[in-house]
Amino acid sequence: MSEFWLISAPGDKENLQALERMNNVTSKSNLSHNTKFAIPDFKVGTLDSLVGLSDELGKLDTFAESLIKRMAQSVVEVMEDSKGKAHETLLANGVDLTSFVTHFEWDMAKYPAKQPLVSVVDTLAKQLAQIETDLKSRTAAYSVLKANLENLEKRSTGNLFTRTLSDIVSKEDFVLDSEYLITLLVIVPKSSFAQWQKTYESLSDMVVPRSTKLIAEDNEGGLFTVTLFRKVIEDFKVKAKENKFIVREFYYDEKEIKREREEMTRLLSDKKQQYPTSCVALKKGSATYRDHKVKVAPLGNPARPAAGQTDRDRESEGEGEGPLLRWLKVNFSEAFIAWIHIKALRVFVESVLRYGLPVNFQAVLLQPHKKSATKRLREVLNSVFRHLDEVAAASILDASVEIPGLQLSNQDYFPYVYFHIDLSLLD
């Protein structure tokens, strides 16, 4: 199970014996795997300050857990074609999350225990707040790129009726800057190629002879050029439609074509450079700007690499990790580590508030073996530590008993200090 129970009991002889009894029972009954959870000695300060820290740490705990879950989900979104590998990506200090929790050691360099508790908590809060700020800005940029790439895919796929033509046509395909002549693009069904060649000149008056040329085709038809006088455009469209030849509304604008091509190149470059491991929009097997499925006639070569693109560049496209995924991996680790440190702080603060001074308690990490055993495990703990708070222990059995001064519901209160750690971050 990816669930842990972090508990503590007083460190006197009687309660250490109780912990030993708990270990024996849970081991023999195969209820949980238990390990000591080392927490350093902190500067306690006043009890009033601990009460305030208890509330602050509770909020920080909730915030940290929410943050790492959002980061885990972001990893899944970036690795759209590798969701099964997301768990392998979510590490803490280079190890899997379970190993990190079960072998937890307080990071003295990052969070010095000699500092006042308030300072340690403040350091953790600022660290997590900065990670969240960066996460928001980076995922917002990712979402914009994803939306733009999805739009690009829509424009770069589909049939000749709907797809962009900027990557198909060239200036040489058109008669431009003529007062009298214009070049139209006509979509002809595959079965009617021969008919088009025989009849296009006679569909209307003033069609330039031998002016047609096939510039692209897909599975359904072909895209032909035809040049005619401007004055017969409407007549030609009507006659063409009668013969199931459809004039595509397209007029060559060199500036617009250049702008669209540059936009496509930029988006694909952003996708490759920023998120090479993600399939943010251009899924495997779908058409793309550089590698579309439309077969282009000799006027252009779609297989030709973009300017400055080497064979190595093309072979390595999609390999490696982009900045977003690298950032997520590094900062997920940092946020997760901070979260477990917060859990340790909560155990320390609650143990001092519960068991008093001088500081003397033992924290233990329990990993239930299976979900069905958690009820029995809870019964064992309540029985072993019942003596710590007879009123609270009784109230567990009698929900009508109110515990004076206790803000939690009785179902959330136990005679021992207890915090839950759930590593099911992607569920």
Swiss-Prot record:
The gene is Atp6v1c2. GO terms for molecular function: identical protein binding; proton-transporting ATPase activity, rotational mechanism. InterPro entries: ATPase_V1-cplx_csu (IPR004907), Vac_ATP_synth_c_sf (IPR036132). V-ATPase is a heteromultimeric enzyme made up of two complexes: the ATP-hydrolytic V1 complex and the proton translocation V0 complex. The V1 complex consists of three catalytic AB heterodimers that form a heterohexamer, three peripheral stalks each consisting of EG heterodimers, one central rotor including subunits D and F, and the regulatory subunits C and H. The proton translocation complex V0 consists of the proton transport subunit a, a ring of proteolipid subunits c9c'', rotary subunit d, subunits e and f, and the accessory subunits ATP6AP1/Ac45 and ATP6AP2/PRR. It comes from the Eukaryota. Disulfide bonds: none annotated. The keyword Nucleus does not apply. GO terms for biological process: positive regulation of Wnt signaling pathway. Subunit of the V1 complex of vacuolar(H+)-ATPase (V-ATPase), a multisubunit enzyme composed of a peripheral complex (V1) that hydrolyzes ATP and a membrane integral complex (V0) that translocates protons. V-ATPase is responsible for acidifying and maintaining the pH of intracellular compartments and in some cell types, is targeted to the plasma membrane, where it is responsible for acidifying the extracellular environment. Subunit C is necessary for the assembly of the catalytic sector of the enzyme and is likely to have a specific function in its catalytic activity. SUPFAM superfamilies: Vacuolar ATP synthase subunit C. Predominantly expressed in the lung and kidney. Isoform 1 is lung-specific while isoform 3 is a kidney-specific isoform. Isoform 1 is localized in the lamellar bodies of type II alveolar cells. Isoform 2 is strongly expressed in the cortical and medulla collecting ducts and is found in the plasma membranes of renal alpha and beta intercalated cells. Belongs to the V-ATPase C subunit family. Residues 298-320 are annotated as: Disordered. The keyword Transmembrane helix does not apply. Keywords: Hydrogen ion transport, Ion transport, Transport. This is V-type proton ATPase subunit C 2. GO terms for cellular component: proton-transporting V-type ATPase, V1 domain. Coiled coil: none annotated. It comes from Mus musculus.
